Amino acid sequence: MGALLWSLLLLLQEAKGFSGDDEDPEEVIGVLQESINLSLEIPSNEEIKHIDWLFQNNIAIVKPGKKGQPAVIMAVDPRYRGRVSISESSYSLHISNLTWEDSGLYNAQVNLKTSESHITKSYHLRVYRRLSKPHITVNSNISEEGVCNISLTCSIERAGMDVTYIWLSSQDSTNTSHEGSVLSTSWRPGDKAPSYTCRVSNPVSNISSRRISVGSFCADPGYPEKPSMLCLLVKSLFLLLLLAILTVGLCLFRAQKSYETPRVRKLKRNRIKLRKKGKSGPTPV
């Protein structure tokens, strides 16, 4: 009986068609595995026979209850069983645990008791995933002219549709931006190193990466870096200090050598005298 009722109602909807097909559907944004509400406003002076919620086929057929009684859901598409509910006051459709397959065009057809006409409202549902934190990959090379060319690639896992990439740079106290997942830039070591942040967004989320400074990616030991005045001053002071230490050490070494030489000679002479005395032996009595 239930299957027969479902088939008859479906044929009836196809035969009637929809009024208001020329109206633009209401855009509705949903989040994957979360819930969405398709609101429905019905004039208070209209008596309702039944309401049909459709997506590809019928999702649910709702018959208002008598005074003080809840509405009766006469049929539910098996794909939505356990995931849909109807508002008692407005007959709006609530869908939980959204999937990618739920995206598309929905129609609410309100069939009136007073006439054969009906009120129709359309919705275009788009389902998106909340974005994860983006990751930046850096590739760099040094040209013959001494310029570091850098390519930054911003990526996220399971991005989905309608994702926007924006690069933000704070340099010289000004904020600049660049659109696209790949940013190409150049930098000469010795200049102030720029830093970048990738911001990704879709209709349901907005998240930024950690800030990346490109200075560390061009730190090549063989690169002809432009030394700063402070660096030159520190190096000069270090060399002067080293030279002073070497000079003092050499002077001390020479002074010690000149002081110890006569003493060593005297010791040698004393040793020779002792040896001669030992060879001559004791004096006879």
Swiss-Prot record:
Residues 25-126 form the Ig-like V-type domain. Its main location: membrane. Keywords: Disulfide bond, Glycoprotein, Immunoglobulin domain, Membrane, Signal, Transmembrane, Transmembrane helix. SUPFAM superfamilies: Immunoglobulin. The keyword Hydrolase does not apply. Residues 254-285 are cytoplasmic. Gene3D superfamilies: Immunoglobulins (2.60.40.10). It comes from Mus musculus. Disulfide bonds join C154-C198. CDD domains: Ig_SLAM-like_N (cd16842). The chain crosses the membrane at residues 233-253. May play a role in the immune response. It is found in: Membrane. InterPro entries: CD2/SLAM_rcpt, Ig-like_dom, Ig-like_dom_sf, Ig-like_fold, Ig_sub, Ig_V-set. Residues 18-232 are extracellular. One of its GO terms (cellular component) is cell surface. It is a single-pass type I membrane protein. This is SLAM family member 9. GO terms for biological process: defense response to bacterium; plasmacytoid dendritic cell chemotaxis; plasmacytoid dendritic cell differentiation. Residues 1-17 form the signal peptide. Pfam families: V-set. Glycans are attached at N37, N97, N141, N149, N175, N206. Residues 134-213 form the Ig-like C2-type domain. PANTHER family: SIGNALING LYMPHOCYTIC ACTIVATION MOLECULE (PTHR12080), SLAM FAMILY MEMBER 9 (PTHR12080:SF18).
